Each structure stands twice: as C-alpha cells, then as structure tokens.
Amino acid sequence: MKTTYASPADLPADQGAKPAVLVWDAPVRVFHWLMVLSFAGAYLTAESERWRLLHVTLGYTMVGLVGFRIVWGLIGSRHARFSSFVRGPAGVVRYVRSLFKGQPEHHVGHNPAGALAIIALLGLTLAIGASGWAVYNDVGAEWIEDLHEGAANF
C-alpha cells in the first residue's frame, strides 16, 4: 500500500533529504477510497431503475462513512483529528493571504483551505444523503429531488 507523506522538499535546507513523515493513518485512507468508490457507484447508477437499490445502498454507505469520519476526526490519530487541521475562518484567510504573497504557509497534512473544503464536502455528502432518503421515501416536494441531483452534480 502506498503511503502519503509530507514532502521532503518542504524541509529546511539544512535538514536535507531526511525521511518523510507518515501523515494519514489506515482508517483515513480506507475511508477516503470507500467514499470514492461509493460516490462513483452511486453516480453511475443514478439514472437506472434497475440499479436503484444499489444506488440507495451506496448513498447510505456514504452517510455511514461520513459518520465514521466525524467520530474519527474527534478521537482518531493525531493527523486524523479535525483539531490538527481545522483552523477556522481566520486561519483560512491567513493561509490564502500567504498564497498571494508567494510564501505559502507549510502545513503537515491539510492546510486551512483544504480543511474548509473537507468540511464542505462532508456537509454536502450529508445533504445528498438526507435529500436522497427523502426522495426514496417520497417525503417532500419535487424540489428535494432537484436538490439531491444538483448537490450530487456540484
């Protein structure tokens, strides 16, 4: 299995090519690839009545995976914890400013902008799951189906 590392190029010049640092643990990697496969499968089966049960099952799987990631983000290993990379709006602004200055802040793992994207994707996945559940159970109006499809295509 390949390992995700912090870039050795980011080390100070006097440290040379020291061994890279392991960042993401196995649960985060498994979560990531199960989410990718579940989303791809759900997306590919979205328009088929024949594969509707698989589509729904993959959607529920994604919601379960988000639940797992939230728990692991609170109790997991050091770099898996949200507290290690979620820095709030001020951190995102500071990081983006450092990009525009041409001197980006170095972060092991996710930078604050990446953390914002992760939180948005987890929330979007929950919205897709909730709207999908409502569509599948005929709860609500037609706009919920539009929301479900629009969020998945976003």
Where are these regions (language model features)?
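Membrane-embedded alpha-helical bundles that constitute the cytochrome b-like, heme-associated redox core
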Residues: 1-154
